[in-house]
Amino acid sequence: MKKICKSGILLILLFAAVSMVYGQSIGISGYVRNYTGVLLTGDYNYAIIQNTFNLNFEETKNKVGFKVNPYVYHYQNQETEYGLRQAYLDLYFDAFDLRIGKQQIIWGKADGVFITDVVSPKDLSEFLLRDFDEIRMGITAVKADYYIGNNTFEFVYVPVFTPTRMPDQNSIWYPAPQFSPNAEFDYSKSQVENKLSNSEVFAKFSGLTSAIDFEIMAGYMWDDDPAMHMLRTVDPATQEPGLTVMPEYHRIGLAGGSFSTTIKGVVLRGESAYYNGKYFSSADPAAAEGVTEKKYVQYLIGLDYTLWGVKVSGQFIQKVILDYDESIVNDQYENMATILLSKDFLRETLRAELFSYIGLNNSDALIRPKITYDLADGFELLLGANIFTGDKGMFGRFDKNDMAYFKLKYSF
């Protein structure tokens, strides 16, 4: 009953807000969407039945502005989810801007990969299948931009840590446990206290010239994913081995950059970052609590071009653990590629697209073909599939989750 009352109150407030601003100068936009997916294995169960209502309220007047972005996800057999993706105020001055509140912050040049794009944490409750403006979670932050010609200095202060959102344990996207079934979990160290010393800070310099667009960034943050500390024990009475898993978040520092330039019609993109303080799982019996701290580098090189009306984009991504030792569970070199093919038809009312992640270490992949058709002004029909190949690795572990889906969306 409390859930029903809470949902009703939120809906009333939401529609009251729409009524108050309708017809005034405040801009209103958003969309309504149905998303239905069916698994292509087993009994062809529904992978998802989701109805989405997304709203944007925006206004800029003189030296101030604001944006509020509430949303509702309704599911057939799950609790309805209400949220506020963004809610911020903008203050404009002669040489700098200030944005305060909940916001999504996007950095870097990569498509579908997060290297320097680390300010906004990720919502992986549906793995990597959500649209990227839904995967990036809003965070409460203060963002200041200072402009000098075509250059921008950006500073971000995040007072409260927000971790990656993982799938529920009953979700088809919940990763298979890597521990024994008898393992116990101790979450006593899994919380980062809300205090000043636990804040996150980021800085970025962006430059734009006639030849190149580039960014240089740095950050002192929390790793959005916890390290799995492990304590092995032996029951003195039965001599049975035991395992206690203790998720814990750690501080991490990083520095990196990205660039984009055009050479004879071909767009060349690059992005890289150096991470200090990452904890990796280790099989070394001498490793304290089964983890070891290492530095690592991740980089990307990408090409975009158009051939016979087809947009072609490719990326190669590599992650390298420095000062590697063989006891680390992860590979020293993790290699991945992405490919995007896209073409418009029927006066740009029909788009065919193929996007694929390819894991080169484990020969696994996520292949995502889709067709989008503009039925009428504001109405869009999308037909697609998510095909997982391989039997292990980041994508192969979901080999039984192949699905076909459609989305019907009205934007206003």
Region spans (language model):
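Detector for outer-membrane/organellar transmembrane beta-barrel domains
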Residues: S260-Y357
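Repeated loop/turn-to-beta-strand initiation elements of outer-membrane beta-barrel proteins
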Residues: I26, N62-V68, F96-L98, N150-F153, ...
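Transmembrane beta-strand segments that form the barrel wall of outer-membrane beta-barrel proteins
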Residues: Y31-L40, G65-H74, Y82-R85, L98, ...
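Residues on the lipid-exposed face of transmembrane beta-strands in outer-membrane beta-barrel proteins
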Residues: F53-E59, Q86-L91, V142-Y146, A203-G207, ...
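Extracellular loop and loop/strand-boundary signature of outer-membrane beta-barrel proteins
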Residues: L40-D43, Y73-Y75, R85, F127-R130, ...
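Residues that define the transmembrane beta-barrel architecture of outer-membrane proteins
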Residues: N45-N51, E81-R85, D94, R136-T140, ...
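Outer-membrane beta-barrel "beta-signal"
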Residues: F379, K400-F412
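Outer membrane beta-barrel
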Residues: T60-W173, S210, G390
